[in-house]
């Protein structure tokens, strides 16, 4: 059983080391097998790099022929290693300029300080003044002219109703 696993591992590594097909770059034109041997870091950035072949229509503007997405390790930005050295002219291990921007943003995001705990909304205490009803339980005394009698209450109600209907007393 152990020999069978070793044979399978060797076969898989041999196939992945070989580019899938043509001599000018294989499947999609990118050296895919080279990534099988590398130990990838914890963070990789997908970069759009020229593939020089593959896709529909090759390099002549066909579908998928000119560019391909390839993982580029971010550790080259920290260690100064020359991973991806076929792309010269940038300060991040020779990555293409678009990828150099992505790596710089990733470095900023990883180096940014933590925001900490969420802010607690603090309000000033509210001092409400309670309004108490009057404490006197004695019946309120009305004046002599304010006392309403039964007959005058009916007359007052009828005069209010007449005022609403449009009847007015003649004024002199």
Curated annotation (Swiss-Prot):
Belongs to the chorion protein S15/S18 family. Residues 1-17 form the signal peptide. One of its GO terms (cellular component) is egg chorion. The keyword Signal applies. Keywords: Secreted, Signal. Chorion membrane (egg shell) protein; plays a role in protecting the egg from the environment. One of its GO terms (biological process) is chorion-containing eggshell formation. This is Chorion protein S18. InterPro entries: Chorion_2. It is found in: Secreted. The keyword Iron does not apply. Its main location: secreted. GO terms for molecular function: structural constituent of egg chorion. It comes from the Eukaryota.
């Amino acid at each position: 059983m152990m020999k069978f696993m070793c044979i399978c591992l060797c076969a898989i590594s041999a196939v992945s080391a070989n580019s899938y097909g043509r001599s000018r770059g294989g499947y999609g034109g990118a050296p895919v097998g080279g990534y099988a041997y590398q130990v990838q870091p914890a963070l990789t950035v997908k970069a759009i790099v020229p593939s020089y072949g593959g896709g529909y229509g090759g390099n002549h503007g066909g579908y998928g022929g000119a560019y391909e997405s390839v993982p580029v390790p971010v550790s080259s930005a920290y260690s100064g290693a020359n991973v991806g050295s076929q792309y010269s002219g940038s300060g991040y291990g020779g990555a293409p300029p678009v990828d150099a921007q992505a790596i710089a943003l990733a470095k900023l995001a990883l180096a940014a300080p933590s925001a900490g705990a969420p802010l607690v909304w603090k309000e000033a205490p509210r001092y409400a003044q309670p309004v108490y009803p009057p404490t006197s339980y004695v019946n309120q005394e009305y004046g002599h002219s304010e006392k309403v009698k039964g007959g005058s209450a009916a007359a007052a109600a009828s005069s209010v109703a007449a005022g609403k209907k449009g009847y007015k007393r003649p004024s002199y």
